[in-house]
Amino acid sequence: MVKIGVCGPVGSGKTALIEALTRHMSKDYDMAVITNDIYTKEDAEFMCKNSVMPRERIIGVETGGCPHTAIREDASMNLEAVEEMHDRFPNLELLLIESGGDNLSATFNPELADFTIFVIDVAEGDKIPRKGGPGITRSDLLVINKIDLAPYVGADLKVMERDSKKMRGEKPFIFTNIRAKEGLDDVIAWIKRNALLED
């Protein structure tokens, strides 16, 4: 089982990305999802209502506190959810774990996630990639979402591209508009090539 952590600020499109990935990949892969919210299971409920996956393949974890603690310093609740999901589905191939909305420093405990996708959106401004932080610099894949909003918020995608290259070196990043499925195929191709080790 490959575990991919998906993190990023509130409203960046983490849940939308996971919903789109399950919709396009679950017919070919045995998949499940774990979501994290501080006080509710709102993202898990959204997934249950909007995903093609059955409810038993989605677990919502209420962290009750700082979102990055539940995925990094004390990942015990999430590790229990991973174990429960594996017990339910022993042949699970791909598990997507969504963090609660957090800042640019969010990273996953290596025991919890084999790969990390960090999601930001252009509505935060084109300065976000150059601000750095572990989410920007250390994630395996950076997804820059909501590119359709760039002209409305004064964000320059060329600046974001330049700064992403500078901050990430050789690590990949993908521009997306998940709502319109723009860039989604590139994210799926990255997962297949890097996480699932397919050609």
Curated annotation (Swiss-Prot):
CDD domains, per the entry: UreG
Keywords: Chaperone, Cytoplasm, GTP-binding, Nickel insertion, Nucleotide-binding
Subunit record text: Homodimer. UreH, UreF and UreG form a complex that acts as a GTP-hydrolysis-dependent molecular chaperone, activating the urease apoprotein by helping to assemble the nickel containing metallocenter of UreC. The UreE protein probably delivers the nickel.
GO molecular function terms listed in the Swiss-Prot or TrEMBL record: GTP binding; GTPase activity; nickel cation binding
GO BP annotation list: urea catabolic process
Native organism: Helicobacter pylori (strain P12)
Gene name as annotated: ureG
Protein name: Urease accessory protein UreG
NCBIfam families the record matches: ureG (TIGR00101)
